[in-house]
Each structure stands twice: as C-alpha cells, then as structure tokens.
Amino acid sequence: MQMERTELPDFFKELSTLVEDAHRYAKVAGVNFFKQNFRRQGFLDTSLTPWAKRSLTIGSDRGVLIQSGKLRDSIHAVSRGIDRIIYQTDPLAYAKIHNEGGYIVVTERMKRYFWYLYMKSTGSMQKRKNGELRQNKANERLSTMASFYKSMALKKVGSRIRIPKRQYMGESATFMKQLDTWIASEIDKRFSNI
C-alpha cells in the first residue's frame, strides 16, 4: 500500500511574507495617521488632545499649523531594519518646536522681519481720496495684523516667546491598536485555511 504525498504549506515563507507586508503597511499607515492629526487639529493618543488656538485669529479659516502644508507633507517613515520604523519630518527649522513646544529667543533679525511685516500690512490698507483710512473689514483685518506685528517687533532682543506644544507625531495607543487589528486580521486570513 502506497500513501499519497500531500504538499505541506511553507509556514516560514508565509510568515516572512506577512512580516514584510506588515512592515510596509505600518510605514504607510503611520505616515497617514500622523498626517490626519493636521485634519483633526490635535494629537490622537488614547483620546484627542486638541492643539492650542493661535494668538492671532486672523486667517482662522485655515487650521492651526497649516500655512503652506510643508510640515504635514514632510512626514515620512524611515526603516531601521525589519523590526523598527522611525517616523520623522524633513529638517524644517520649526518642526521640533511645534511638536514639543518650548521657547524662542527674540533676535535682531526677527525684530527686523516683524517691522517689515508691519510696514507691509499698513502700506496695503485702503484709503479714501482724502487720505483717510476706509472703515472696512479688509482694513480691520490688516489693522489687527499690523498691531500684532508691531508688538512682536517691539519685543526686546533676548526676550523669550513661548510656543505651545502642538504635537502631531509621537507614540499613539490608537495607532498601535489599529496596527494590531490589521496584523491579527492578516494572520486569520493567511493561516486559517492552512
């Protein structure tokens, strides 16, 4: 009596494929998760921690930390072997201070820049034919911006400006739970019929 040979599934091959797919999924899903924090306007760990509102509320139709989108678009994943992924941003000067919060020391260059912004905003105010300023919303907005720029320009060199923590990247229990759920479903899918 001769027995039939049955092909045994290659568990190790299937497992290594799963590890590679999980690594790829974690890189993409992590970057997307951290970019979602810009839409959420806060950091999602176990619950959402909303970001502090900006002090100058002009232009509030756009979200906090969103001006050009460079910070959000600079988030990417770097592989450190098959068992480690690091999420980071491109080397933007303001990325770390926004994520962690802290203080900025006022420099002479900053003061000159704020004087420039002040002059630019007051110069673009609309005037009547007799030279008086018009009483309209555009001028009101420019006036508010101009007073903010002037107050920043008048700060003493060496004084400190507090930048609130607006975390957009870091350890997140919600993301880890999503990743665990995905891996568990993939294990069920791949190994249930073997």
Feature roles, as predicted:
Residues 1-194:
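Short, Lys/Arg-rich flexible segments
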